[in-house]
Amino acid sequence: MWNVDVTCIGGIRSGEATLRPGPNIVQASNFQGKSSFLAAIQTAIGTTGLLTEDHPLMENEDDGKVTLETDEETYTVSLTRATDSDEPAISRSGTPYLTRDQDQIAARLFAVLGEDNPIRAAVREENQERLTELLKKPLETENIDLRIEALQREIKELEDEVAAAEAASADLPAAQQKVTRLQGELRDLNETRDELERKVDEETDQRALRDELTAKQSDLEREEARLERLENQVDRRKAQLDDKEAALESLDIPDSPTAEADIAEKQTRIDELAVKIDLLDDLHRSTKAIIDEGEIDLITDVERTLSGDTFSCFVCGAETTAEAVTERLNEISDRQESLREQRATLTEEVTQMQQRTREIESKRQQKAELEDEIKRLRVDIQEDQHEVRSIEATIEELQAEIEQREAEYEAAEKAGESHSAELKTIQQKIGSTETKLDRAQAELERIEAELQKRNDRQEQLETKRDELETLRQRRKQKYNELVNQFDAAMADIIGRFAPGFDGAYLDQKTDANDTVGFEINLARDGHTTDLDTLSEGERELVGIVTALAGYRTFSVGDRVPCILLDGIGQLAAEHIRHMIEYLENTAEILVTTAYPEAGSFDGETVSPEHWDVISHETAQSRDHPQITN
C-alpha cells in the first residue's frame, strides 16, 4: 500500500490519496488533478526531469513537495524554482524511490505510460529512429555500447601491433641468412689470415707482436660491440620500466568487498526466502480458490443466517467469516511481496559483491605481475649498467695497449716481407666482418623479440575479442527478448481488443557497422502496412504495447512495483477495461485515469473530491500551460 501526499505539483495545490495493490482508477472530470496526481507519483519515484523534460512544479510557485509512504519506507522529494536567472530552472532534492540513473530511465520509458511517454510519442509520430534510441536507452546507462566501442578500438590497436610484428617476422629468414653468411665469411677470412701468418712467420720474427696486436684489436672490437648491445639493451629496459610503472600507477584497485562468508550467508537467506514464498503462495492460492468458488462447505460446516454466513475455521476450528479469511489472505499476499522484495535486494547484493570480488582479484593479479616485472627490470638494469662500466674500463685498457703494440709493430714491420700488408688488410676485413656480424646478430635478436611480443599481443587480442563477444551477446539477448516480448504482448492485445489490423511486429535490423535499429511493421488484410494507416486509438495501443515489452525485457517491475497509465481517452470504455484487466497482473500497483462517463471499474477508485486544485479559469490565465486534468 502506498500513501501519496502532494503539495504544489502540476495543478494540485494540496491533496493526498492511498494506492492499494491492483488497479487504482483516478476517476474525475477535467481540471480535477488526474494527470497531476500521476505526475506527483512520478516525482516521488524519481522519473521527472529526464530526457530534457521539466519537473512538474506548479506554475508561479517556488516550492513543491511529494511524500510517498510505503509499507517499509517514506520518501520525500522537493522541487524548487531558482529565482536568480532570467529563465528560472527547477531543481529536485530529497531521496526518490529510485536513485540509480538506469532505474529512473527504465521506469520513465516503460512504467510511466502517460500521454507524454517517450515511447508512445515516438510511435504516435512514426519516428522509428527515435524509437530505436529510446529502446536502447537502458543499455546505454550500462555503457554497453561505449564499452563495445572502446574494446573495438583496443582490438584495432592490438591487431595493428600484431600485423607489425607479422611484418617483422617476414624479415626473419633474411636476418638468419645474413648471420649465417657473415659467419661463413668470417671463417674464410680467419683461414686466410692463418695462412698468411704462417708465411710471414717464415720470413720475419714479428709473430709475437702481430698475434698480440691482433688479439688486442679483436678483443677491442668485441668489447665495443658488447658495449653497444648493452647500452641499447639498457635503453629498451628503461623504456619497458617506464611503461610498467605508468601502468602500475594508473591501476586502481577498489576496496575489498564483504567476505565470502557474507555472500554465502546472503545466498542461504535467498534460498530460505524462496521456500517461504513458495509455501505462502501454495497456501494463498488454494485457500483463495475455495473462497472465490464458494466451496467452503467442502471442508467445513457453514451456518447461513440473515446477517451473513459463518463457519468454523478449517485450520484452528474458531468461528469466522469469508470476509475475515479474505482479509487474512490479503495479509499473506502482502507478506509474499515483502519476501520477494527482500529476495530481489539480496540477489542484487550478492551479484554485485561477486562481480566486485572478481574485478578486485583480477586487478590484484595484474598489480602483482606488474610489480614482479618492475622488480626484475630494475635488477636487470642495475646488472647491465654495472657490466657497461666494466666494459668501458676494459676498452680504455685495450685502447692503451693497442696503441703501444701498434707502435712496436710498425717499427718491426719494416723488416717484414710483402705478406705483411696483405695480412693487415685481412685483419681489417676480419674486424669489419666481426662488427657486421655483431650488428646482424643484434638485428636477429630484435626480430625474435618482436615475434615474442606478437605472441603476447595475440593472447591479449583473444581476451579482448572474448570480452567483446560477451558484451555483444548480452546486447543481442536483450534486443531479442525485446522483440519476443513485443510479439507476445501484441498477440495478447489483438486477442483482447480486436483492432483493425491483423498483427504488429517489432523488426530488429543490423547495419554494416553492427548498429542495431528497431522498426514497427504492421499486417492488415494479408499485406504489410505502416503506422500512419492506423487510427489514433490503434496507434496509442501499439505505443503502450511497445513500452510494456520494454517493461518486461528490462525487469522494470523488480525496480518499481507500479505502472502509471494516462492519456488513453482515445480508447472506448470497454477497451479501457480490457487494458486495466491486461495490466493488472503485470505490476503490483496499477494507477490509471478515467472520466466519470466511462462508468465503474473493478479495483480501487481514487477520488480527488477533497484535493485543492487550480480551476479551469485559473489554468487559462497562466502564462504557460499547466497539468490540471
Curated annotation (Swiss-Prot):
Signal peptide: none
Protein's cellular compartments: Cytoplasm
A GO biological-process term: DNA repair
Principal location: cytoplasm
GO CC terms in record: cytoplasm; DNA repair complex
Family as reported in the entry's similarity comment: Belongs to the Sph1/Sph2 family.
Entry protein name: Smc-like protein Sph1
